[in-house]
Amino acid sequence: MRKNRRHEDELREVKITRNYLKHPQGSVLIEVGDTKVICTAALEAKVPPFLRNSGKGWLTAEYAMLPMATQERNQRESVRGHIGGRTHEIQRLIGRSLRAVTDLDSLGENTVYIDCDVIQADGGTRTASITGSFVALVDLFRKMKEKGICETMPIRDYVSAVSVGVVDGQLLLDLEYEEDSRADVDMNVVMTGAGEFIEVQGTAERVPFGRDRLTAMVELAGRGIRKLTEVQREILGGQI
């Protein structure tokens, strides 16, 4: 039995609070166990140079952590004067994941900015950021449609993400930091509501894994994704 008496195939408690901030068109606080991330979605009427005069839109993401989101204070990257490799990797992952379910052609020449700020970290911050940002994105798109910026909802499907790993020989879903820090294998999986893969990031931290273990990890992640999609569907009222 894991912390909080969780089973090996059980997600942490997930709570998503919509309209968490006053100013963004879309904003949520997502809580996955003790991990807490504020996700916002905002629209700007311009696109990167490579999309000018194309009639198409763009979506990009930024990710950051509060200095005391972890047990020991980390210096802000803005103070250090550069963004670290981990942050770059996570930002690109969030952006790719959301673009995969967004109809960029229907956005017009507008850019959606997704901002994810981790206020408390206990493992799974990048997966929580993707899951929460999707809800903020849908709220933004609903407001765009209401204002006539787009004729239809520029969203194709749900998207969420979850971690799986092997710890002490056991296959676990949705790793907390303590589990992740001693995992033999660590994997992050991003999937659509229809069960299609957007990204699979798997690493043998200590022990290589075979094809059967890989299949089992992907199947376990898929079960977790289905539950996360249900949470998103419920919080959004069942329609996107």
From Swiss-Prot:
Pfam families: RNase_PH, RNase_PH_C. One of its GO terms (biological process) is rRNA catabolic process. Keywords: Nucleotidyltransferase, RNA-binding, rRNA processing, Transferase, tRNA processing, tRNA-binding. Homohexameric ring arranged as a trimer of dimers. Phosphorolytic 3'-5' exoribonuclease that plays an important role in tRNA 3'-end maturation. Removes nucleotide residues following the 3'-CCA terminus of tRNAs; can also add nucleotides to the ends of RNA molecules by using nucleoside diphosphates as substrates, but this may not be physiologically important. Probably plays a role in initiation of 16S rRNA degradation (leading to ribosome degradation) during starvation. HAMAP family: RNase_PH. Belongs to the RNase PH family. This is Ribonuclease PH. It comes from Syntrophus aciditrophicus (strain SB).
